[in-house]
């Protein structure tokens, strides 16, 4: 607030020998050095059209673009002092063609904010004002599966643990008639030795992985989106479903065991090549993969949706039976 800024200015003027407040950059530098202002906040204020740094009860303190992608920032709850992640858009952002073609849904975000679970990320609130739209979620500690796999494949035991957590998360969404629609190694985080968490997109409605207007808040390389696209997406008008979520889980499981995308020539496939691959080519698995695990994965990635597990609950039971499979 302006009153807070005036108080800080008076404090700084006193502590620095009454430096003139007319020296705006000196004052800003001192505010950064004393922890009152972040470099990100200063840069935001200096933009031709400044982005808001206070949204409802939240203060925007830093960018998370390197970690999470465009429009992600770190926020602090002013009243509780807790740190949160925030995805935010200005009016200009939402005028981009991809958002106009596939706009955010505040109603969807409110639905997601009411759903919680130990293996799901927690979305706290959505703020929609004339000049901006923002969603706030808890901060996750750890690293995405994609980064973890850059160091090598998971063990069978770790992959089963990952699947238990992620299937629990997906079952919680499906039970509330919500489709994830963006399951890739970017949406699964290892938060501790014993826990994986599923990130979700609470505000952009799920869409085909091949969509030209793809703008999920979970920043995902095109190759990973296409690698997890169920065969039925080759049909025009196909929408994400429970079955396409299960297919994506199977691909991610195989990816985790191999340490790479489990389809041949994946780095050379165009969109048509990916569609033919999902329709015709068997998924790749390591030779050392135990047969009970391989059987689960093959059920998940069956070309015909009716040949897959019926739902996430049936998959959870199959995974529970894998104790000792490693």
Question: Where do the model's predicted regions map?
Answer:
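Non-catalytic accessory regions
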Residues: 1-112, 123, 129, 135-137, ...
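AlphaC helix of the protein kinase catalytic domain
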Residues: 145-154
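Activation segment signature within eukaryotic-like protein kinase domains
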Residues: 162-163
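Protein kinase catalytic-loop region centered on the HRD/HxD motif
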Residues: 168-178
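C-terminal lobe helix-coil module of Hanks-type protein kinase domains
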Residues: 227-325
